[in-house]
């Protein structure tokens, strides 16, 4: 087994698992939808063939048992019930675990005996010993030359054949047939338990069909089916002028490009020092080309948020059943694209927030009825672009956040005083939820309520340069809003100097730079404040924030006015070096205690390492 074959198997398996979960969720709401049943059967059947070909026998055994049950449903001998759907969902959970094991070098081993027994229990005894064997047929259909609506006759044939089995291939493809882009004949590959004569009779029963030839395919076709499908998909991708590239290759290319940005910065420094105008002119043109390359690379790394969102419908269903609640998850904007690196970071925070909405937000059926609500709660998961950011909102129509309860807990924990609590805004009250160990849950549940969720969520979001806020109304629901950057690799920044160091400030956070008189700074309740454009803002000495020597100019101070999600404030600095396009490098394990104050570091053209401020933490 080659690495490429294994990678292809894992990729295809993941796609079929997602299709199984998505279609099962739809089938639960529409249990008489035969098309959904056929789609689910087709996914299980293909999964079985792939697994058997690759030698993952337990995966093949489980999908075969699923296929037997789904075949009974498909042939109207078994009804779709909540119990049946639950068992199939248990199968998909097993398969997810088994595929993960294969991905990490295992053979997909798992204890599936109980689940297989549950599947077999759904079947009638006589059906267990008298299951029909499906065969693969190649069917050539010729329509009369005088027929006026050939496409209509062809589609009728396809619909009749779909009722007898699974259509795995048509020549030409389905779209071409529907557009009548064929002469008189077309071919269909059908997997069916019917005989050749039965299939032929059904097609000839359609008017204006001149000739039908049904040929049974040899067994070899099924053995190489996964390879055929892979080749077919590859051909389709080539037709669409798209290819799949491993993320590692894109990352390597991005790293090389980032090094070129650093080298360009070094050449910029040389050009400025030598005042070489010709070199500066060429650098300007190179910058334009470099920008195009950068945009192309970043676009290659963009993936839809659906790659994270698609795990949540099944999760919400499972959790709702455990808690005895009825919950609908509505997803919007799943095709919104964001950097793959950002996607990898937001998965766990979103899990925390959605579990929180299920556990604390959505009420039980009885409580919702009592409050005059629909007994089914709704959680909306929405994503959309906003400038250079992506906004993700998790909103529920549940109980909302009890502000009085939040304040009482905060007072009891000495987070705020009772006097301070009377002056707090709603935003300030809700912000208390993100303090470490803070929870308003009366009881600790298996899902949440241990006070270890929301602080972790905020810290993770802050580390990637994002921000999170909450809006809530009692008995109307809550909305958690996350705003994250589209990409974390290359950012526009303002380089500033303090008394001892240089720092990079994201340009998106900078409002303006002004000079102020030190005498204008007022000291109130331990804070330095100044009147800025008819608004009182806090002033911080940036160097002093990191234990540097404070600036003691008596005449005037340089103030960089910046904004974050919560407020506008000023940073006292020594000098502004200028705007730079910088490459963001992660800090790894360095600065562990204060790492949250920095989103990363960069290397300047002169070789200096500069820390990048995360202003959301100020």
Swiss-Prot record:
It is an enzyme of class 2 (transferase). SMART domains: CheW, H-kinase_dim, HATPase_c, HPT. Gene3D superfamilies: Histidine kinase CheA-like, homodimeric domain, Histidine kinase CheA-like, P2 response regulator-binding domain, Histidine kinase-like ATPase, C-terminal domain, HPT domain, SH3 Domains. Involved in the transmission of sensory signals from the chemoreceptors to the flagellar motors. CheA is autophosphorylated; it can transfer its phosphate group to either CheB or CheY. Keywords: ATP-binding, Chemotaxis, Cytoplasm, Kinase, Nucleotide-binding, Phosphoprotein, Transferase, Two-component regulatory system. It comes from the Bacteria. This is Chemotaxis protein CheA. InterPro entries: Bact_Chemotaxis_CheA, CheA-like_dim, CheA-like_homodim_sf, CheA-like_P2_sf, CheA_P2-bd, CheW-like_dom_sf, CheW-lke_dom, CheY-binding_CheA. It catalyses: ATP + protein L-histidine = ADP + protein N-phospho-L-histidine. The gene is cheA. Residues 490-618 form the CheW-like domain.
